[in-house]
A protein has these predicted regions:
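Conserved small/polar residues in nucleotide/adenosyl-binding loops
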Residues: 159-160
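Conserved N-terminal subdomain of the carbohydrate kinase-like
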Residues: 2-96
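Conserved beta-alpha-beta core of the PfkB/ribokinase-like small-molecule kinase fold
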Residues: 64-156
Length: 160
């Protein structure tokens, strides 16, 4: 890592620790603890609310929203959509982790709906997930990609 990048990274870390942003995660139960701990280590404050009745209120008090499709269910999809609308109304970033969209039509249709409605700011996906979101043939095994990150970034960059 170059000294310039290290310096910029240090400034970003300092800014996050100074602000202590609240990050609302609607994530999967497999990684919820890891996501909360990483958020804390970065100097931010995690909240892991996924009940549809409270997500708009929680999101309206957050500084960013993370949506992870890892363990998707209809109730969670409803909560994610409500939270994403609240985030858009507040003007905060929404990060979508489209886990397994190449393996499940339910996940793909839902992720595309969020994207097409302008409810996502950043997509954090692997090669196969990015190709699936571009409605291209995506090869993967389960939720894992057979491609590489560089190819995925190249594919996404061509659409912008």
């Amino acid at each position: 890592m170059s000294l310039v990048i290290k310096g910029q990274f240090g400034l970003i870390v300092d800014a996050v620790r100074e602000k202590r942003p609240v990050i609302h995660h609607l994530t999967n139960y497999v990684t919820a603890g890891d996501c909360a701990n990483i958020t804390l280590c970065a100097g931010a404050s995690p909240v892991m609310a996924d009940e549809a009745e409270e997500v708009a209120e929680i999101t309206s008090n957050a500084d960013a929203l993370v949506l992870n499709l890892g363990t998707i269910a209809k109730a969670k999809m409803q909560a994610m959509e409500i939270a994403a609308v609240a985030a858009k109304n507040k003007g905060i970033a929404v990060v979508l982790d489209p886990v397994g969209v190449m393996a499940s039509k339910l996940r793909l249709v839902f992720a595309l709906k969020l994207l097409n409605e302008g409810l996502v700011t950043i997509v954090r996906g692997n090669y196969a997930e990015c190709l699936a979101l571009l409605e291209e043939k995506a090869e993967g095994k389960g939720v894992d990609s057979n491609g590489n990150v560089t190819d995925g970034l190249r594919a996404v960059s061509y659409t912008h």
